[in-house]
């Protein structure tokens, strides 16, 4: 991403702010009148042409004005937005959080509804629980170089893992590992299996042909614990989508609705963002929606009971990133602090 001059960055920011407020192409005449009284229309047009050439703006075919491109939004999110003055948000959210006799889940739900009202966009709230219990591991040979491991949980969920092997000795090692796992860790919570890995490694070391292969290809790949968390998803404010001009087309709206309903998308997003302590912005091309004017702002709230709560605001790429980032970050900070106080100052989980 190429760095812009100070003036180019200011022009890009003004165009995006204007387009966020009023979703119509922005021209040099408006910029001169509203934002840059000291610059001529010619200068602005030249700078806008440079921004368009570099891919930060694009031209609407029915207007001489420009609109932001996805690259422009990425630059805006990364370099041009700062945390809003959060004092007012903190005050209002704290009033929600300090309501007596409310559980953490209830407080998060109230916070989500507050965000709905503030941005007029839907919010996807996904709860991740670590209570899944392993009941059985099955092995299926697919061909001479690939096997499928099935991990079955007590709730009936089946997690599939494909394991590659180069020869019969490695396949025999896989069978040995499956027998050991079924003997040693059945009826163990997935989140507790890590505590048994050192013992398992010592048992496996004396039983297999290629110990390092087992470690690299089986243990590390098989027990990816984030994937075993139960996910419970709720969507709040879905009706707000119909208010966005970008989603007026029925086919486009249907694709966005399908995105909201796809739990795996939100699980994957949480897994990718698990070490991110702030707000993450994901654009449509990363969500399987190439060419769509959609983006997602998300954050993870960690609580001391090993649960996680992902909040994701879904909207057009022209959403007010400064506002949504401030809302999500403030809610995350306030709830994690409140949860820590409830549990005697224990640090919230960040895994």
UniProtKB/Swiss-Prot annotation:
GO terms for molecular function: DNA binding. The keyword Acyltransferase does not apply. InterPro entries: GAF-like_dom_sf, HrcA, HrcA_C, WH-like_DNA-bd_sf, WH_DNA-bd_sf. The keyword Iron does not apply. GO terms for biological process: negative regulation of DNA-templated transcription. SUPFAM superfamilies: GAF domain-like, Winged helix' DNA-binding domain. Keywords: Repressor, Stress response, Transcription, Transcription regulation. Gene3D superfamilies: 3.30.450.40, Winged helix-like DNA-binding domain superfamily/Winged helix DNA-binding domain. It comes from the Bacteria. Negative regulator of class I heat shock genes (grpE-dnaK-dnaJ and groELS operons). Prevents heat-shock induction of these operons. Belongs to the HrcA family. This is Heat-inducible transcription repressor HrcA. It comes from Mycoplasma pneumoniae (strain ATCC 29342 / M129 / Subtype 1). The gene is hrcA.
